[in-house]
Amino acid sequence: MQVTFLGTSSGVPTRARNVSAVALRLPQRSEMWLFDCGEGTQHQFLRSELRLSQLRRVFVTHMHGDHVFGLPGLLASLGLAGNSNEGVDLYGPDPLESYLNGVLRTSSTRIGYPLKVHRVHDCAENGTLVYEDDDLMVRCTPLTHRVPAYAYRVDQKPLAGRFDIAKAKDLQIPPGPIYAQLKRGDTVTLEDGRVIDGTTLCGPERPGVSVVYCTDTVFCEAAVDLAQGADLLIHESTFAHQESEMAYQKQHSTSTMAAQTAAEANVGQLVLTHLSPRYAPGNAVTPEDLLKEAQAIFPNTCLAKDFLTLEVKPRCNSL
């Protein structure tokens, strides 16, 4: 998995940071998922190496404009980018469908591919999966914000153990398509009549990776529970610690709240995003100050910036 930040500012864009959007690339299936879609996100795609035509799913955390104003335009442009017949599935709060229908209808915009909206409220409340396929699972949980908001967790299912080619050659198993079957752990009958159990040629299962996207929220235990043991936690950090009172009033997180969540959840790495424009470089408090505050609590923290790309690895610990 690869994570690319397309927008890392809160509320409004700045010269250096667009508003919220994070792309999750799944290279093994030539597919991409998007988390939030603030105004200007499709322009960010044009400035990146991402291919909009690979977009398959969009997960929306909440209905504030800096997280959704870019969605109608992006979906309209997607039809011109050669989107596949599979279409796009969207997941989010209850008002997401009526919002999109209203904008598309009043602007006389026609979407020429399948588009389906899934409400996540019941999944969040009941602890059921938002999405699952052969390789991945997605869960969500309610956050504490001024409007209904949800954090999402993507878990890759365990990977098959590594195939021992040397052992296969020692057994005089001829190379070819049969190796693919054995790699999957299938039992195969060879032309000479021998029956080979593929699991005997594979090492132990390897853990998949996990990513949690958590915004907008003040510190809450639900976020800690969702993020338990995750390899990568992307967490909003709207305010510096000295603005804690304002953070509680507006139900946003400080840098120290994000770090506290990461520490209590025992994640591999924390990335701070959704920074208030007030912390621009050269101001009294800068993004680097927020980073230092978080690192004092959770050392393996980095600061997101637009177009930063991370390769997600088990217990993610490096850029």
Swiss-Prot record:
Keyword tRNA processing: yes
Reactions it catalyzes: Endonucleolytic cleavage of RNA, removing extra 3' nucleotides from tRNA precursor, generating 3' termini of tRNAs. A 3'-hydroxy group is left at the tRNA terminus and a 5'-phosphoryl group is left at the trailer molecule
Catalytic residues in the record: 66
Cofactor remark from the record: Binds 2 Zn(2+) ions.
Membrane-spanning residues: none
Listed EC numbers: 3.1.26.11
A Pfam family it matches: Lactamase_B_2
Keyword Aminoacyl-tRNA synthetase attached: no
Superkingdom classification of source: Bacteria
Protein function: Zinc phosphodiesterase, which displays some tRNA 3'-processing endonuclease activity. Probably involved in tRNA maturation, by removing a 3'-trailer from precursor tRNA.
Name assigned to this protein: Ribonuclease Z
Source taxonomy: Bacteria, Bacillati, Cyanobacteriota, Cyanophyceae, Synechococcales
